[in-house]
């Protein structure tokens, strides 16, 4: 998979030099992510690609197209190939390994970016909705772009999203055949909310090379936190990396 992505990036880098409509970047970083489940935190050294041609883009595991694009408003139709969560029983803490495997879903959705120029030209409101065979999500975020210098970007954000009952029941519910160890009761949660805040920063050494860092924190409503297989805590995702823009 990584060889395939690098080959695609190499091809797009050649095309980008010949066509201004092509844009591409690749980021190599290191990140840690608290698990919502009763298991170990995730540590990874990901390669993150971002490729676009006119109104079509590939960003990480998401592909999409903008069909409305104005100075203050744009709308995007997208497909997320790794939506949701993935966990095996063998990766859970001792006493919680009787659960069935939870898998990612593929989701299709709509999202928009709306500039709130009445308050600030750097303030953006971003609602979105997505649906997959394991449930739906709907939410919105508010982000601010601050540039203390031409080569420095700082962007704080806050957001919330709603997870449907079908979604929360699949990822956080407990069926009878999963009982065992510390899991003593079935659990059938209703729809839930997630509240989050984040901070992103990027420093450009040159036009093509930059360093970035980010921290994201989220908190789930009680429907998720009361599940026997989840941790009742703030979920933190921290990372940093180097980015090359073609």
List the predicted regions and their residue ranges:
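Cleavable N-terminal export/targeting peptides
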Residues: 1-23, 227-229
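Short glycine/proline- and aromatic-enriched beta-strand/turn motifs that initiate or cap beta-hairpins
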Residues: 19-65, 166
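Extracellular loop and loop/strand-boundary signature of outer-membrane beta-barrel proteins
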Residues: 33-36, 95-98, 126-129, 182-187, ...
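Structural signature of outer-membrane beta-barrel channels/translocons
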Residues: 52-54, 68, 113-119, 145-147, ...
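Outer-membrane beta-barrel transmembrane domain signature
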Residues: 135-139, 143-224, 229-232, 244-246
């Amino acid at each position: 998979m990584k060889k395939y992505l690098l080959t695609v990036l190499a091809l797009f880098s050649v095309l980008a030099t010949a066509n201004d409509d092509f844009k591409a970047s690749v980021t190599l970083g290191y990140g840690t992510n608290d698990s919502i489940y009763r298991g170990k935190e995730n540590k990874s050294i990901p390669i993150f690609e971002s490729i676009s041609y006119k109104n079509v883009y590939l960003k990480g595991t998401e592909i999409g197209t903008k069909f409305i694009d104005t100075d203050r408003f744009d709308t995007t139709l997208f497909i997320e190939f790794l939506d949701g969560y993935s966990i095996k029983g063998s990766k859970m803490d001792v006493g919680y390994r009787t659960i069935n495997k939870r898998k990612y879903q593929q989701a299709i959705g709509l999202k928009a970016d709306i500039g709130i120029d009445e308050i600030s030209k750097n303030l953006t409101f971003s609602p979105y909705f997505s649906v997959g065979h394991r449930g739906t999500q709907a939410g919105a975020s508010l982000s601010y772009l601050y540039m203390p210098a031409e080569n420095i970007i700082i962007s704080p954000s806050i957001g919330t999203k709603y997870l449907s009952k079908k979604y929360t029941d699949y990822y956080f519910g407990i069926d009878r055949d999963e009982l065992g160890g510390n899991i003593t009761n079935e659990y059938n949660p209703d729809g839930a909310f997630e509240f989050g805040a984040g901070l992103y920063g990027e420093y450009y050494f040159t036009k093509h090379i930059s360093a970035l860092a980010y921290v994201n924190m989220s908190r789930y409503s009680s429907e998720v936190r009361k599940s026997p297989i989840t941790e009742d805590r703030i979920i933190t995702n921290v990372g940093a990396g180097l980015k090359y823009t073609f």
